[in-house]
Amino acid sequence: MSLRISKDVSVSVNTADLLPEDDGFDRVDGDNRGWFSVFLGLFNTHPSDWNIALNEAIETIDWDSKSITLAQPLGNFFTFAFYVVRLLQLSLIKPNLSRINEKTDHFDLSKSEMLKKYEYLYHFTNDKNQSVGNVYYRFLGRLGKFFDICIVLLTFTNGFITYKFFWGNFKMYCLFYLKKGPHLRNVTKASLQKLGQDDDDGSLWSSLRYFWNGTKDKEGSTDDRDDDDGDIHYKLFKWTPSQFITMLFVSFAPTAVVFLLFTEVSFLTLIAVIVHQWVLHRLVIDCYGNRLVHESVIASANLAEVEAKFVKPRMSKKVQDVAIDCTPHGDGMVKFYPALTTNRSHIFQTHSLTGELITETFNPSTKEFEDLQTEGTTHNVIRTAPYAAGDLLHRDPYWYQRNMIMRDVAHRPYFHSREVSPTRYHPSRISPRPGQYSPLVSSTSGMSTPLMRPDRSPFLNTRPSLGEREELFHRGNSRSPLRQPIENFKSLDRSSDSQSPIRRHNGDSDA
């Protein structure tokens, strides 16, 4: 990206590339100073700032991308670690539990002050405590306590993962245009008047109060407002567990923990654990998870098809600004200008630091903005009319207009209403044929840019000469009421021996 100082001067926004490199700068020393300053700043930081920095660091990590590389191996490790601990507890600690807890069944003679007075008795008790068997059993006792701590930690970890999977990922959607709400558990009614109020502060107490007391109260209060549908909206709480939590839940499932915790674990139990892990992964990840992905792909394909077949053909029509010469001189000049509207092309207008207006267009092939030159730019200039241009040199400018009007009179239906019939004085109801240039085209019909719209020509309201009106009525024996005024006009300019059909008909009637 670049910063436009003027139309001709632009500066790159990334100023790091413009800085000169220092040959005496040691990158290793700079990194050491940076780490030292960070380490020193930890002692001057408030604990609340530590919490904010830690949460920001956790939230900025893309956990979904680490679901296969981190979540799945970690969950499987927890599951098999739980299996190994339970196997050692039942096969190693439980058979020797009586030997491990032997000191708790009688008095500890080593702590007796009376026995210490007798050296031979004290020596006997000291040798017994230092025997190999006693050391082994003491080691098993400490190992059993370590196994108990591991079982408690793994159980709490599994409970936390289960809670985050089932109740820790919800998104609320407000449905304002849904008239009849579905009968679902996670869909509730709410008033539009309380839309900006925070009813739930998100605390544990408010959640418990909602589940124990608030559910029935809200359902009863919303049922009374079924008639007034204009003041309510629906809230949908969608369950959206992340891919990382889902993979961690599947690989370290609570069903496996409960199964290993309440059954006799042996070496054959490993087969059941492996089958359980495979079935759960196949069911949730491979089948149901891929089904959701496939449905989203199908929905995206349907939207793309609707956009390609329905939206784009109607919203992105290929139009172009046109300037048409509508003067009576019949020059037939047509200028095609590029469309400068934002809904037709990727065109943006910005201002430089000096206040100059810059028009840029986005080039999808290069992914860059390019300047668009709009001053004096025309395309496809047509200067010759596509029909008999030579006739325009001998006839008046309205010859084609009058012939086209009278040619359409024979095919024009009779208008029963009081609407004005299309005549040459109302040419707006007659459109030229496609692909032909006609002076009937209005000067405002071909352009959408106001700055390109020319003034209306004063010659458009000029009447044709009386001598050329003979071509308007080339049929004989017509009883149209319009013939009488035409005859009067012609009698002023033509001789009595005219051989027109009008004069012959009048001569026969006089005779």
Curated annotation (Swiss-Prot):
**Record localization:** Nucleus membrane
InterPro entries xref list: Nur1/Mug154
Q: Does the keyword Transmembrane helix apply?
A: yes
Please give the start and end residues of each transmembrane region.
146-166, 255-275
Q: Does the keyword Transmembrane apply?
A: yes
* Family label: Belongs to the NUR1 family.
**Pfam families, from UniProt?**
DUF2418
Q: Which GO terms describe its biological process?
A: maintenance of rDNA; regulation of exit from mitosis
> Which keywords accompany this UniProt record?
Membrane, Nucleus, Transmembrane, Transmembrane helix
The record's region (Disordered) falls at: 420-511
Q: Which gene encodes it?
A: NUR1
User: What does it do?
Assistant: Member of a perinuclear network that controls recombination at multiple loci to maintain genome stability. Required for rDNA repeat stability.
Cellular component, GO annotation: nuclear membrane
* Membrane topology per record: Multi-pass membrane protein
What's the protein here called? Nuclear rim protein 1
Bias category Polar residues: which stretches? 439-448
Q: Which domain of life is it from?
A: Eukaryota
